[in-house]
Each structure stands twice: as structure tokens, then as C-alpha cells.
Amino acid sequence: EFLKMVEAISAADGSSGWVASFGMNPAYLAALPEETLKEVWGDSPDIVFAGGIFPPQPAERVDNGFRIKGRWKFASGCMGASLCGVGILPAEEGALPRMAVLPRDQVKVDPTWDMLGMVATGSHDLVVEDAYVPEAWTFVRGGKPNVDTPFFRYPSLSFAAQVLAVTTLGLAQEALDIVRAMAGGRKSVTGAPNLGEHEYAQIALGKAEAKVRAAR
């Protein structure tokens, strides 16, 4: 049902659909310790999370936590976030990449995003000058969730891939619908056939429709 909603929103506006897709972020955050999850959602379910994962930045382990700094790109929705996550790579040998979660006021948003057609995703850079993040506020991205319900048993990285893919599915379907409407329009003043009466257009539209259906 969530995927269907994201697809419908994306058909109306691609940027809105892209940002709406990140409503699945609780699937990521479920890998935080249980006590941290209570702090995140203990007072309200209306917590907006945005993440800048790449490139992961080196993190020094200190006092049961990490000292972090750096710049992370493509943090969609960060302007309206209450919590921000950034990708870190602990310094110790063999450590897995993690995500560190910080309050929005500890993160600077550098407005670098000005992409034609998708500017409203607000996928700006995140900058952290120097911050301490307790280990309890970090997690391995895609790690085992600490919430045992059907939703959280589904692999979070697989879910993330699906919600992002369905955004483009909504855009593609809307584009097809627009072309179909144009193809059946009025004939030109010269009496030439409209687009939909041309065999090459029918074939191209049919192939495109087949690709969208196969992707769905």
C-alpha cells in the first residue's frame, strides 16, 4: 500500500514522490538500540529523518561513541528534518560502515542542490564541523532491527530500493498517460493524421507501456 501511495504521489509530482518515499526510514532506524528508539519516538510519531550517506567519512572512536566531521551529499528532505543521519566509517580494522544520527541543529545544510525538474527534493549537502555521537545513536545500515514486527522483518535495504524505484515508475506512467492523451488529439488544420494514427507511434507507445508494466 505504501508503494502504491508513493507511485501516485510521484505521478503528480516527482519531487514530492521522491521525498515521500523516505517515509520508510523507520525501517532503517529500527537498527538503533531499543532505548534510543524510545527517545526518538517516545513523545511523538511525527519525526522526520533525512540522511546523507555518501561518501562515508572516517570517524574516531572516543568515550563510547564517535567524533565525526565531514560533508555528505544528496540528503533529500533535509530542510524539513528533525533528525539527520550521516554515513561514517569507524577507524578500527574490520569495522562496518555505520550511520550516525544527530539532531538537526548539530548539522549544517549547504544548499548545493539545484537539479532541473527535481529541485524540490532539497537534496542538499550535510556538513558537520565537529560532533560527538554516542554509539547508541549509531547503527549499521541494513543491520538487524531491534523491533520484531512483520514490517521490520523485511530487509530494509531491499525496501529502500523498491520505494526509490517506484518513484520513477509513477513518473513513467504519468508520461505515458500524457503522450496517450496527446496522441488521440485533434487532427491538424492540414488534415494530417494525429500522432495516435501513426503505426510507429503505436509501436513505441506499446513498447514503453510493456516496460512500465514489467517493472511494476
Predicted features along the sequence, with ranges:
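Short Gly/Pro-enriched turn/cap motifs at secondary-structure boundaries
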Residues: I47-A50, M115-V119
